[in-house]
Amino acid sequence: MCFFIGLVPPGYKYLGPGNSLDQGEPTNPSDAAAKEHDEAYAAYLRSGKNPYLYFSPADQRFIDQTKDATDWGGKIGHYFFRAKKAIAPVLTDTPDHPSTSRPTKPTKRSKPPPHIFINLAKKKKAGAGQVKRDNLAPMSDGAVQPDGGQPAVRNERATGSGNGSGGGGGGGSGGVGISTGTFNNQTEFKFLENGWVEITANSSRLVHLNMPESENYKRVVVNNMDKTAVKGNMALDDTHVQIVTPWSLVDANAWGVWFNPGDWQLIVNTMSELHLVSFEQEIFNVVLKTVSESATQPPTKVYNNDLTASLMVALDSNNTMPFTPAAMRSETLGFYPWKPTIPTPWRYYFQWDRTLIPSHTGTSGTPTNIYHGTDPDDVQFYTIENSVPVHLLRTGDEFATGTFFFDCKPCRLTHTWQTNRALGLPPFLNSLPQSEGATNFGDIGVQQDKRRGVTQMGNTDYITEATIMRPAEVGYSAPYYSFEASTQGPFKTPIAAGRGGAQTDENQAADGDPRYAFGRQHGQKTTTTGETPERFTYIAHQDTGRYPAGDWIQNINFNLPVTNDNVLLPTDPIGGKTGINYTNIFNTYGPLTALNNVPPVYPNGQIWDKEFDTDLKPRLHVNAPFVCQNNCPGQLFVKVAPNLTNEYDPDASANMSRIVTYSDFWWKGKLVFKAKLRASHTWNPIQQMSINVDNQFNYLPNNIGAMKIVYEKSQLAPRKLY
C-alpha cells in the first residue's frame, strides 16, 4: 500500500514537495491551495528563480488560503510557511509570473525590472517549445475564489514619456507597458480513466468599452400604454421600472463564448453527460485612450494613450448585487474570437407594483391599468461603489478573479423516448403476424376484462394499454401559452420543453421550445441598422413535456360502456361543447413526476444559473442546464473612471465635464468540464449531429467576411429511462 506520492501525506495529492502536478482533482481546499502553490513554484523555476530559498507571494497566498483550515495537513502547511516568512528573504514577482498574494493598491509608476528583458531573450531563444509551455501554464492567478474570496490585481507599468497632447497626463507613442498574458481559444480534451474526459475550454476576446453616457444611477419607468390600451394586446405589455447604472457587465455565460461548432459536434456525438467543474477569468493588457478634436475645418479626431486614466473593475464574488445573466437578452460577450466585442450596459429591475385588468366595459373598451408605484417596504437600491470592492487599473495592468468551483448536478447529452405508454412489460400476444409487412395487427387474444395486471380504475375490470398502472408520471401537464398575473404585471408561465406539436416547424415554438433572437455578435450573418434579428427555435427531443396543444384529461368516473359524454378530446373536451375547459386542465408536477433537465442550447443558450433564495426551490430552471446549488461565479463589472477637466463644477450640472475616454482590454477565461464518454448499447447505429453539403457553407465566411453560426442539437442520442 502506497502512503506517499513524492512527499505527499495520505489523503492529499499536492500538499508536499516532490509531487506531480497532474494528480487529478484536489481532495480538499487545502490540497487545492497546495496545487496552485506548486504551479506558482513551477512558474518561478521557469523564470530562473529558486522559490525554495526565498519567501514568495505564492507562500503568502497559501498562508491566507489555509488560515481557517480544519484539516491537519492544511494546518501544518500554514504554520510551516509562516515560519518560513519569519526567516527567509523575500522573493519579488516578475511580470511574467505575477503574485498570488492578496490585491495591492497601485503605487507609483516604476521601471520594468531588468529580468523582464532577460526572460524575453530566453523566450526568443527557446523558440516554439517555450511558447507551447507558456500556453499550458496556469493563468496569472490560480487563486481559489471561495464565497467572499478576493480577486488578484497586478500593477506593472513601464515608464513612458508622452509626446502627445492627450488629457489626464497621457502619453503619446512612448512605452505604455509590458505585454502580459496569452490569447488562447483552444479547447483541450484530456482522456482520463474509466471513460471520463476533462474538457478545458479557453476563451479570449478583445473588449471595447466606452465611457458611460452618465456617471449617475437612474431610475427609469417604462410604460407602453399606447399598445396595451388596445383590446387583446396584453402580450405586448412592456411596463416595468429599472435602475440604469454607469457600469457594464462582462458576461461569458453562453455556450458560444467557449466552444466553436466543431468542438460542440465532437462533444455531443461522443459524450453522454457533462459536469461543470470550475471557472476563472482575467482582464489584461489594459489600454486607455482619450479622444480630442482639432480646431481645423473639417475637424480631425486625435487619439492619445492616457497612462493615468483608470479602468474600474469590480467582482461581486458574494453575489450581493442583483443577478442579471445576459444570455436571456443575447448580450453576452461575442462568439467570434477574432472580432472585438463589447460588454453590455448593466441594469437591474426595481420594484414597482402595477395591475393590468384585461377587461372591457364594451366591445371597444380599453384594459384597466392601475399603477400603485413602489412600495416603501420593498425599496432596494444597489450601487456597486458601496457594495463591492472596486479595483483601479491603468495601462498595462491586469486583474484575475481566481478559480471558482461549481456545485451543480450533471447535464445529460441524451434524450429519452419513453413516455408512460412505453414503460414496463408490454401485453402478451397470443398470436403473432404470419406474413411480412402485415399492418393493423390488433389481436392481443385475451378479452379486456379477463386480463391480469394492476390498475387504479375502481369502476371497471378492463385492463388496457390506457388503464394499466404505470410506475410513475413521465413529464407533466401544463397550460399551453398561459399568462399569469403578478403584482408587477402579466407574465408568460415557463414550461419544460418537450417533444410534440409542430416539431418540424422551426419557425414556431411548440410545447415550450425556446426561440432565440440574436445579432451579429452572436451568429447572425448580416445586419443593418433596424434590421430584424435572426432567429431559430430549439426543438427539444425530450419527452419531458406532453402535447399541450392536444392535451386531454379524463376527470370523471370511468363508466361502462364509454359514452361520448365521458371522452375528452382536444376538439371536443366535453361532449356537446366546444373549446377547451380550463377547469379540467391541471398540473401533474407532483411527487410521482419524472422529469429530465433542460438541454444545453448551442450557441446562444445560458450555461449556469443562480439558485433562488427561497425555502421551496424549483427543481429545474428553463434557461440553463446547470443550477449552482450554493454560490455562483461573481458577476464582473467594468467602467471607465471619470476623466475630469479643469472645468468640472459639481454644482453647475448633473453631467460632469469629462475628457472623452475609452478603453480596450483583453479578456480571457477558462471553463472546465468533466464528461462521460457515451457507450454503445444498441445493435443499430444512431443519428448524430452532422451537416449536409449546403449547410457546411453556413460556417464559412463569404467574400466580405460575413458568416453565421447555426445552432446545433445537443441531445440527439436516445436512451431508455426505465
Swiss-Prot record:
Pfam families noted in UniProt: Parvo_coat, Phospholip_A2_4
Keywords: Capsid protein, Clathrin-mediated endocytosis of virus by host, Host-virus interaction, T=1 icosahedral capsid protein, Viral attachment to host cell, Viral penetration into host cytoplasm, Viral penetration via permeabilization of host membrane, Virion, Virus endocytosis by host, Virus entry into host cell
Start and end residues of each stretch annotated as Disordered: 90-115, 136-179, 497-531
Listed GO biological process terms: clathrin-dependent endocytosis of virus by host cell; symbiont entry into host cell via permeabilization of host membrane; virion attachment to host cell
InterPro entries listed in its UniProt record: Capsid/spike_ssDNA_virus (IPR016184), Parvovirus_coat (IPR001403), Phospholipase_A2-like (IPR013607), VP1/VP2 (IPR036952)
UniProt remark on domains: The N-terminus of VP1 is sequestered within the mature capsid. It contains a phospholipase A2-like region and putative nuclear localization signals.
Function statement: Capsid protein self-assembles to form an icosahedral capsid with a T=1 symmetry, about 22 nm in diameter, and consisting of 60 copies of two size variants of the capsid proteins, VP1 and VP2, which differ by the presence of an N-terminal extension in the minor protein VP1. The capsid encapsulates the genomic ssDNA. Capsid proteins are responsible for the attachment to host cell receptors. This attachment induces virion internalization predominantly through clathrin-dependent endocytosis.
Protein family (similarity comment): Belongs to the parvoviridae capsid protein family.
Annotated protein name in UniProt: Capsid protein VP1
Source organism per UniProt: Mink enteritis virus (strain Abashiri)
Lineage: Viruses, Monodnaviria, Shotokuvirae, Cossaviricota, Quintoviricetes
